[in-house]
Amino acid sequence: MKEAFGYANIEWKRGIDWDAVRAFRLDRARDAMQRHGLGAMLLMYDENIRYVTSTLTPGWNKLKPGLRYAVLVEGKDPILYEQGDIGIHIKAHSPWIPQENVRHSFAWIKGAAGPASQMQVDKFTEALVGDLEDAGVKDRPLGVDFIDITMMQTFERAGITWTDGMTPMMEARAVKSPDEQNCSRIVGSICDALHYEMTQFLRPGLTENQVAAHGFEFLYSFPGVEDVEDVIVSSGPNAWPNWRNFSDRIIRPGELVIIDVAALTWNGFKSCVYRTYCVGGTPTDEMKQYYDTALTWLRDSIDAVKPGVTTRDIASKWPSAMDTWGYADEDEAAA
């Protein structure tokens, strides 16, 4: 039976058990930290902060590691350094974090430089050292998911031994609980709904940005959708190579249009689902041939997915960019 629940939990039937999701994630992060011999982790990227604290990063914070950050020390609850006085709201909205562990950040922005940046990174580091000393792990390696040259120099003066913290977090996040798997299915359902909506909306004469705007409006109407990074609309000559953007270009009859729901975020779970449409006309035999070829590549790679295989095994089902399109190397075909 397919999942019998929707976007929101209700009283009379089982939905996503968010308490179980939070506990599962924190256990996996702690296990990864221990497995890599770390005494603590400093997490500055949104996906890692979300994983260990289950708190929401505002959109304007997401590309600026350090405006808010989290510290996970061995044997203790996560510490959240929230941007400014937003912590007041975190204490109300996220009671699973102890009140005393919600603090204001000593806001840092990646790559900051200049005299004022040194004063700020000193405050940032002093608070971090206090957390490590309180937990008795000051002399243990600190895993970091981000670092820049100013932090490196200041950490060295403070006697902090830092190392890779992104790999442990990626290992933790790679395995999904049954609840998390259902979350991904819900995201897939939202993407299916958007693509069906586009079959009703697309028509010649619309511009790419009009189509993108409709997609944004449609997606943000779903409960739990907190961010839509992009709705890519590439039409006609923009469809190949797919320029992965949108513009004021007018869609003409019979053209191919690629629509990509790029990083729709529902309760922290993301998408990347794209489909190709022939708008206002019938696909040519050449278009059908390309479609059949691409569909074969896709199905062959899906069939290769099973426990124990590597991403290399899956990628081997796809063609060589050098042989197929004459590119210089595989990186030129990155999408």
Where are these regions (language model features)?
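Active-site neighborhoods and metal-handling regions in enzymes and metal-associated proteins
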Residues: 1-335
